[in-house]
Amino acid sequence: LQSHKHDISFHGGYIGFFSYDYGADQFVDVSSHPQPSFFLGEYSTFLKFQDGAWYFYSDEKQAQHIYESISSLLSQAQEDQSTALQLLKKCAPRWSKAQYFAAFNRVQEYIKAGDCYQINLTQEFKATAQGTLLSKAEQLWQLTHAPYAGYLKLDNFELLSCSPELFIEFQHERKIKTRPIKGTMPRFNDPNQDHAANAKLSNPEKDQAENVMIV
């Protein structure tokens, strides 16, 4: 852990998440676990992993004390092997193969009926484990090389994430940047390659649908 100052996009503020369950819960009861589906917390102290190291940021008056407390907790965590995440029972899907195909066929009927344009059909995978997700965070991020990632712990609830996509970034002078991947293609300096990529993106129905829905 190092105390360092970088020109970073995040200088403190809200950290949290919105889950799909939060949106769905406005219309149907989807609660199956005692865990939050939405959380926002305002933080002026945070850690960020960049350039191969962790950096500490804080606008608090007691920043030095907070830094020392976090350093102490991290040292204790490294010595405590009980926090290492271990699977006690393998991951298993909530649905059987037959149940998944039934849900898939129902989605097709919804689309044919015009009730929806696209549906992202997913299901829950469950496992029994001991330890904390934090012990696997760095390993996951190094494995995926995802440019956007985070870890959040709320009481007994943990959230570990990584993504290649940037949804929304608020910049200076009221600018908003987004970098989706679905329905997009890379740009090329060569005009012929750029034109070919544009044609490839414009023609397939799948890419057109994703572009209309997401981009």
Predicted features, each with a name:
Residues 1-215:
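Extended alpha-helical targeting/anchoring segments
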